[in-house]
Amino acid sequence: MAIDYSKWDKIELSDDSDVEVHPNVDKKSFIKWKQQSIHEQRFKRNQDIKNLETQVDMYSHLNKRVDRILSNLPESSLTDLPAVTKFLNANFDKMEKSKGENVDPEIATYNEMVEDLFEQLAKDLDKEGKDSKSPSLIRDAILKHRAKIDSVTVEAKKKLDELYKEKNAHISSEDIHTGFDSSFMNKQKGGAKPLEATPSEALSSAAESNILNKLAKSSVPQTFIDFKDDPMKLAKETEEFGKISINEYSKSQKFLLEHLPIISEQQKDALMMKAFEYQLHGDDKMTLQVIHQSELMAYIKEIYDMKKIPYLNPMELSNVINMFFEKVIFNKDKPMGKESFLRSVQEKFLHIQKRSKILQQEEMDESNAEGVETIQLKSLDDSTELEVNLPDFNSKDPEEMKKVKVFKTLIPEKMQEAIMTKNLDNINKVFEDIPIEEAEKLLEVFNDIDIIGIKAILENEKDFQSLKDQYEQDHEDATMENLSLNDRDGGGDNHEEVKHTADTVD
């Protein structure tokens, strides 16, 4: 396996050999000053991070209290400070306050800070010459202050992100930790009993040790499954993991420890798309189950990615899996983590339900837009148009009587009404509701009794006159030709008669 040397790019100091300084500057002093500068910058960066984290956390607690007051406390009580204090103490821990290395131990509690805010806002209104006893003015002042806090919080988080990136870009002694380690312990002959493992849904210590020992002894390098050519493709193991029921966490943990390569972005996303497939078939139970299993993979992968290991490290990934299940899933003392996880699962389930309905509706609309194949009558030649011919209902002619009989018996009543209007649009409108096979048979009936005819279209009077002249000329030519033929025939007879007479005389 190739060794990744990129992590050494983060080291800020090099050895003496490649440090170039001015000839008048002592190299050792320069390196010492450089070290000192780096340590000072690192210390300042860490202090800034701690201060901003404390600030963001404090604003979060204060906003929570202010929002609860604005939502649940009657507006008329906003100017009554004792009522505000009573409400705060009833809904929040009155002793809760900000803590940390950079926080003054004597700092006021969160409830006291909110009370001070109300007092200060009332004083500010008095200074501006406004009525500080007006609940609506107090509410407006609180909302303005709340907006300022939000703005400051956004800036603080933005600055924090920059500091985190800067910190992660360099290696320091804080980042050094034990990778692989082993030790021997003498067996205890007597004395205190070893701690007994408390009953838990988690894997037993023995089972976990067996899995980790297998990983440690395995000499075959593992890689994350990634079907780059087919992002929707699921590995057999991943599909099997998706079939594990929601509440079988121990089984899920054991399965992941034994199938580490499936914890990849591609497999996690492919499993989530499988949930879409189940939902489109109306299977809510399997949809929720597959989403739940996909989220387990997603949370574990996200934690592992924070370690910035660009390949599959079996021991590290196994530690992450065990830590996740221990701290989030099986942690009964602090259930917030599991609640947050399940909330995320539920949100994705609702999202997939909503998206599936939209996709089904779009497919239905598209199908309706394409429509059913129908027959429409239209002339294909611009110089002609179709006309509707009705049979003669009063005629005694056998042919016409036959057409009338076919018209009344083989043509649907609705189509008969459309034909009687002699309007082609009305006929086409009826054709829209007739299946293609039936419409084709109806066209054959039309053809048999000459319902639809074709007539030529003359664009103007000049065309009509030209056609008329052409007809008359053709008629005249035909007449002259007949006369000529008659004359020729008559002359031939006389010649024969003369000839025959001469023969007789001779």
Swiss-Prot record:
GO MF entry, a single one: heat shock protein binding
Assigned keywords, A-Z: Cell cycle, Cell division, Chaperone, Cytoplasm, Phosphoprotein
Matches recorded under InterPro entries: Cdc37, Cdc37_C, Cdc37_Hsp90-bd, Cdc37_Hsp90-bd_sf, Cdc37_N_dom
The UniProt record lists the keyword Chaperone: yes
Region named Disordered: 472-506
Stored SMART domains: CDC37_C, CDC37_M, CDC37_N
SUPFAM superfamilies reported in the protein's UniProt record: Hsp90 co-chaperone CDC37
Location relative to the cell: Cytoplasm
GO BP terms, alphabetized: cell division; cellular hyperosmotic response; fungal-type cell wall organization or biogenesis; p38MAPK cascade; positive regulation of MAPK cascade; protein folding; protein stabilization; regulation of cell cycle
UniProt PTM: Phosphorylation at Ser-14 is required for the interactions with HOG1 and SLT2 MAP kinases and is crucial for adaptation to stress conditions due to high osmolarity or cell wall perturbation.
Presence of keyword Metal-binding: no
Sequence positions bearing Phosphoserine: S14, S17, S367, S466, S484
Subunit comment: Forms a complex with Hsp90. Interacts with CDC28, CAK1 HOG1, SLT2 and STE11.
Stated role: Co-chaperone that binds to numerous kinases and promotes their interaction with the Hsp90 complex, resulting in stabilization and promotion of their activity. Involved in both the HOG and the PKC MAP kinase signaling cascade necessary for adaptation to stress conditions due to high osmolarity or cell wall perturbation.
Other facts: Present with 10200 molecules/cell in log phase SD medium.
Family label: Belongs to the CDC37 family.
PANTHER family: CDC37-RELATED (PTHR12800), HSP90 CO-CHAPERONE CDC37 (PTHR12800:SF4)
UniProt-recorded name of the protein: Hsp90 co-chaperone Cdc37
Organism: Saccharomyces cerevisiae (strain ATCC 204508 / S288c)
